[in-house]
Amino acid sequence: MGDIVIELFPNHAPKTVANFVELATGAKEWVDPNIGEKVKTNLYDGTIFHRVIPNFMIQGGDPLGSGMGGPGYNFADEFHGELNFDKPYLLAMANAGPNTNGSQFFITVAATAWLNRKHSIFGEVKDAASQKVVDAIAVAKTGANDKPVQAIKISKVSFK
């Protein structure tokens, strides 16, 4: 569908940004749930956006592709007073409750104030071309559990 360029917020969410970058580059060890072993490889390349909800968000970062996978560890939430879900195109950690961040993330496509202080915001999709890609993913046809009928794959995560 195209590239999604994201500006990360290391000054506002340093641990969350570090976790994302280290998982994306293979610098951090994680447990691959597909094989049950510790690995030190890029987690995100080849994964899919496994959950898409129009007018809300697109979610990825699960090595299983089901919404049930992660890196085999959790880390604490990071909230910053300057970061709120008051606009679309924010990058945040998906979780299963307080301090359960792992590898799954989502990008909003609308203001989602009810998520404030529940999910760590650590980046933003700022350019119009990238926002169009996010919007296109957000309206993909979905089936059970909001999973796109046709896989939408993350081919490569890279950093400048």
PLM regions with names:
Residues 1-160:
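Cyclophilin-like peptidyl-prolyl cis-trans isomerases
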